């Protein structure tokens, strides 16, 4: 932080500042839970709704607004956030941009797949991993949060497996979930360390490919190989557009204000961040926390704008119908997950082309229905899986930053084409489905782009050479 700026002493320890910012977000969720109860008039159902959320299976896609009320979903999010805050504090973790990502991915899924009960087996498993490797738990705290991507498996073991109907918590189920947590906690860290060789850092959701492959293995062991029937769990309501908009727009405006308060005039340096390619970076160290807060606010408002203006075009019975996005628990979670890598490479300039790619890809199922190739249109931009998929497609932002607008558009279109098919690999039990898909897209695209376009560094060198001539 520059000398003479406001509260200069406050940012002497950036790690503590990042933790405090994340804790403030958690407090905001607690306030949101109380406000939601007043807004919907069912404040007395917040606690029962929270208990219902925690005691039900959480296989993709569960809408916690519908399952446990709006206030109950916010309370679950707040409790998950508080668990993350306390784990980081007690373990003495060094908080940085990756911690911001891990936190937001964890709380993001707390409205449609993560619960206060299904995160603990993975925190415990990662702690066991730290004991085995004889390292401080704080050094792997981020990995503990990423490991919660397997939360639906834990819920399944605790309250339903191997049947199709929930039977409630059992001792055997809790022990099985704990054993799964130890397995995931010990296996996932080395996998996460290896997967950058697959996507070369072009998938911001770097832990997602590792989670996806591991979920595929666990799914086969628990269901496919023994021949156990796979339960289905889609549970969606109509959402709550007004409340979600007011809550997040308020938070994002406060982020912009906080950035300017911590460092006057830092918004001028935000232009430098917008020009950054976003590949293998940490905005908190490269541009400072105040500028990162500005990006949090502006990128967050960009996300809200997208989810408010996006409309799906559907061909139905000889007529064209336009649908709008429902602000369900899953949509709210998508907003938070899309926000996750705001400190590690995501920003409006590099994500916009990916959204364009999604829009172009949506024309394929539309014209398939319009021309009579199929009877029913398979999906549109407002299909819930696509709304969630778009949030994880934003993880391909470094492709835009390194290879340009059209490469980013192509990445978005390919991601939209694949994302609804990938759950067949893991049965809907891996929460990082879209990030897993992004890793596959990056693995397919980057070698081809490098071969035909050259690397970012090579193209910059050519531009510099042409200027000198």
Q: Can you describe what each PLM-predicted range is?
A:
Residues 177-194, 206, 381-456:
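C-terminal transmembrane helix pair
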Residues 266-366:
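Transmembrane helical segments that form the transport core of multi-pass membrane transport proteins
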Residues 235-240, 272-278, 455-469:
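Short, highly charged, low-complexity non-transmembrane loops/tails of multi-pass membrane proteins
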Residues 2-114, 259-263, 285-294, 301, ...:
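N-terminal signal-anchor module of multipass membrane proteins
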Residues 66-78, 109-120, 169-183, 317-332, ...:
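Structural signature of hydrophobic alpha-helical transmembrane segments
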Residues 6-17, 135, 140, 151-245, ...:
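Membrane-interface helix-loop-helix junctions at boundaries between adjacent transmembrane segments
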